[in-house]
């Protein structure tokens, strides 16, 4: 006999009345593939139906007062133990579904954290509902201007991968960054001894990183004096230095403590406080838990001085509504080399997301539009004159 599917319930509320309206909001990340990131659906709640998304706004048509549910989870398409829906509506009954765990994730010896659910109330209009949501989001992480505000230059943008980054290159780039008013200079993949699969100079891997205990130390051939000259010159110019980092992915981030110690050591030796976290794949609840442990350990040991730029461009990651307590979101890779950078595309994504995600939580790229103009020849509108 076929067993009946059981809906995993995060939260639910049952209100009186027949005139409930709702809006579900679904998000897409994996922005290397997706360029439409926000999907709204307006409904009149009737008989029991399911909807996808991280947000559900519901309001009573008789008095226009409402509630919202925020599901603190990755985007719907990459959630763990996903049952195809995030919300159920049934007249005045609203249910948040999907715990992000299965029975195999629950053991008697420890607490297993599910996805989160936030309930908020709001008044009579659109502004009220968005203000209620934003009021909560602003309190997830204490905002500090000296830590959280930045205009960042990243070395990956010149498209040479890791083939150019070295002490001389970085010192020259710092001078140019200062002229542009850059506040943070981030050295991407290539500063470290270990080689990633994206290396242009050697065949590398993200697996078994800790087979090389020096993987996350500055490459002595590129940086013979370590990162000290870079950090020193940055301070003189008023520019903070950041680094790229890829946690060791195998076995559900089982080496999270080693990763945490590597980050803490970089903070203590060089004062590095900004790390771009790349290459994540979260295949299980254990992996998600270990990532929380990694981030929490680093913040604890650095008195919350560190901020993580969490890459949302690929794979199964945290999306826009999970891990928000740790920093900001690196939204997308767009390159003139690939003819996929148009300013209005980028600004459109920022505009649509900013309705539901604080804009200051999003890192948005702006490129040198005078590079590769030949690739845009023949388009109906001149690339260099495109506007949002």
Where on the chain are the PLM-derived regions?
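An acidic-aromatic substrate-binding cleft motif
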Residues: 132-176, 180, 184, 188, ...
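Short conserved micro-motifs at the rims of enzyme active sites and ligand-binding pockets
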Residues: 81, 125-126, 163-165, 320-321
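Short, solvent-exposed loop/edge-beta patches enriched in aromatic
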Residues: 3, 178-182, 237
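Conserved, mostly hydrophobic/aromatic
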Residues: 109, 153, 234
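Conserved small/polar residues in nucleotide/adenosyl-binding loops
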Residues: 384-388
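Aromatic- and carboxylate-enriched substrate-binding clefts and catalytic-loop regions
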Residues: 186-375, 380
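N-terminal accessory beta-strand-rich subdomains and adjacent acidic, glycine-rich linkers
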Residues: 1-133
């Amino acid at each position: 006999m076929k067993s009946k599917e059981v809906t995993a319930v995060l939260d639910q509320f049952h209100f009186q009345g027949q005139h409930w309206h709702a809006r579900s909001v679904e998000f897409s990340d994996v922005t290397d593939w997706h360029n439409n990131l926000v999907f709204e659906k307006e409904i009149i709640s009737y008989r029991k139906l399911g909807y996808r998304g991280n947000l559900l706004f519901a309001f009573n048509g008789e008095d226009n007062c409402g509630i919202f549910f925020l599901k603190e989870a990755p985007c719907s398409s990459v959630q763990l133990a996903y049952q195809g829906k995030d919300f159920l509506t049934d007249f005045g009954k609203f249910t948040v579904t999907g715990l992000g765990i299965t029975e195999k994730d629950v053991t008697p010896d420890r607490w297993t954290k599910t996805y989160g659910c936030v309930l908020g109330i709001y008044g009579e209009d659109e502004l009220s509902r968005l203000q209620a949501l934003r009021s909560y989001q602003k309190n997830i992480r204490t905002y500090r201007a000296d830590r959280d505000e930045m205009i960042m230059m990243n070395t990956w943008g010149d498209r040479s991968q890791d083939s150019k980054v070295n002490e001389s290159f970085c010192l020259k780039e710092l001078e140019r960054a200062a002229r542009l008013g850059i506040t943070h200079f981030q050295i991407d993949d290539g500063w470290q001894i270990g080689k990633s699969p994206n290396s242009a100079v050697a065949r590398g891997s993200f697996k078994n990183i800790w087979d090389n205990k020096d993987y996350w130390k500055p490459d002595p051939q590129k940086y013979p004096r370590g990162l000290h000259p870079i950090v020193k010159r940055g301070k003189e110019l008023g520019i903070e230095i950041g680094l790229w980092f890829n946690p060791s992915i195998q076995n559900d981030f089982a080496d999270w403590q080693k990763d945490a110690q590597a980050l803490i050591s970089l903070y203590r030796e060089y004062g590095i406080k900004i790390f771009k976290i790349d290459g994540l794949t979260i295949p299980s609840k254990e992996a998600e838990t270990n990532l929380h442990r990694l981030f929490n350990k680093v913040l604890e040991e650095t008195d919350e001085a560190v901020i993580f730029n969490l890459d949302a461009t690929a794979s199964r990651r945290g999306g826009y509504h999970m891990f928000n307590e740790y920093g900001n979101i690196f939204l997308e890779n767009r390159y003139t080399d690939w003819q996929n950078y148009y300013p209005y595309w980028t600004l459109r994504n920022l505009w649509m997301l900013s309705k539901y995600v604080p804009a200051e939580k999003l890192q948005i790229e702006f490129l040198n539009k005078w590079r590769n103009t030949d690739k845009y020849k023949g388009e109906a509108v001149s690339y260099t004159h495109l506007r949002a």
